[in-house]
Regions:
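Short, solvent-exposed loop/turn positions at domain surfaces
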Residues: 34-37, 55, 93-94, 124, ...
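Long, intrinsically disordered low-complexity tandem-repeat segments
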Residues: 3-26
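Non-catalytic DNA-recognition/assembly elements of restriction-modification systems
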Residues: 29-53, 214-220, 225
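A short beta-sheet element
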Residues: 70, 95-154
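Sequence-specific dsDNA recognition surfaces
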Residues: 44-57, 73-102
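Short loop/beta submotifs within extracellular cysteine-rich repeat domains
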Residues: 1, 55, 76-79, 114-115, ...
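A short glycine-rich beta-alpha junction/loop motif
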Residues: 128-134, 165-186
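Amphipathic alpha-helical segments
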Residues: 1-3, 23-26, 37-39, 178-219
C-alpha cells in the first residue's frame, strides 16, 4: 500500500542519515588521531552496537551447555580481560538469549558499591557466549584489550560512579555507559600500549603469592603506570 511504501522510504532515509552521521564521526576521530595522536571519544562514538543481556538465574547455571557470564562474575571472577567463561547454561532454558563474542566489552550495571559500578572486562576467547541480565555488551572495531585497560583507569571509574547514590544496590545504564569518555589513539598505538600493560600485568600476577605488602605495592605501581600510559596530553 501507499502507506507502507511511505513508511519504508522514511525508514531507509533514517538509516541513510544515521550511516552518514556515523561515517562523519569516524572521519573526525581519524583526523584528530592523525593531528594529535589520539582523540577523546565517548564510548557511544566507537560502539557499533550496545545492548543489555538477558537474565540467567543461579538455578539455570549448569556444568555443561553453552558458555555464559552472569553480572556478579564480572566483579568476582574476571579481570581486565578473559578468554574462557566459568559458567554454562542450557540454551533451551533462556527465553530471550543475548550473545557476546570475541572482542566484546561486558559491563556489570548492577552492584553493591558506587566505587565499583559498571566494572568492565573484555572477552578475547573464540566461543559465542550468553550475556546474563544486568550486563551491557559493547561491540566495536577497536583493540578490545585497549578499551578494557582504558576503562579500568581511575579516570574512567570516576565517570562510571558519577551521580550514583550510595545504597544497597547501585545501577548504571546503557546511556550512562555510552557517555564515558576515553582517549583513543590509532590501532597501532593501542596495540603497543596493550603489549606493555599485558607484560606489566603478568609481572604483577607472578608475585601474587608473595607478602601482602609486596603485592599491594606492586598493584599500586601497576595502577600508576597504567593510568600514566593511558593519560594523553590535555586528556583528564
Amino acid at each position: 500500500t501507499e502507506q507502507n511504501r511511505t513508511e519504508q522510504n522514511r525508514t531507509e532515509q533514517n538509516r541513510t542519515e544515521q550511516n552518514r552521521t556515523e561515517q562523519n564521526r569516524t572521519d573526525e576521530i581519524k583526523l584528530l588521531q592523525y593531528v594529535f595522536g589520539y582523540a577523546v571519544v565517548q564510548l557511544g562514538d566507537v560502539a557499533t552496537k550496545i545492548y543489555r543481556g538477558s537474565g540467567i538465574t543461579r538455578e539455570q547455571v549448569t556444568t555443561d551447555g553453552i558458555s555464559c557470564v552472569r553480572y556478579g562474575e564480572i566483579y568476582t571472577t574476571y579481570g581486565v580481560w578473559f578468554d574462557k567463561c566459568k559458567s554454562h547454561t542450557q540454551i533451551s532454558e533462556i527465553a530471550n538469549p543475548k550473545y557476546f563474542e570475541h572482542g566484546d566489552i561486558l559491563f556489570a550495571i548492577t552492584g553493591e558499591r558506587v566505587e565499583d559500578i559498571a566494572k568492565s572486562t573484555a572477552y578475547v576467547g573464540n566461543e559465542k557466549c550468553l550475556a546474563g541480565g544486568d550486563i551491557v555488551v559493547l561491540k566495536h572495531n577497536q583493540n578490545p584489550k585497549y578499551l578494557a585497560y582504558a576503562l579500568s583507569t581511575h579516570n574512567a571509574q570516576k565517570q562510571k560512579s558519577k551521580g550514583k547514590i550510595k545504597s544497597k544496590v547501585v545501577h548504571s545504564s546503557v546511556p550512562a555507559i555510552s557517555e564515558i569518555t576515553i582517549p583513543l589513539p590509532p590501532l597501532s598505538e593501542q596495540e603497543r600500549i596493550v603489549k606493555i600493560l599485558d607484560r606489566f600485568d603478568s609481572l604483577c600476577n607472578d608475585i601474587s603469592s608473595g607478602l601482602p605488602a609486596e603485592i599491594e605495592a606492586r598493584k599500586k605501581q601497576y595502577e600508576y603506570y597504567r593510568d600514566k600510559l593511558l593519560s594523553f596530553p590535555h586528556c583528564s
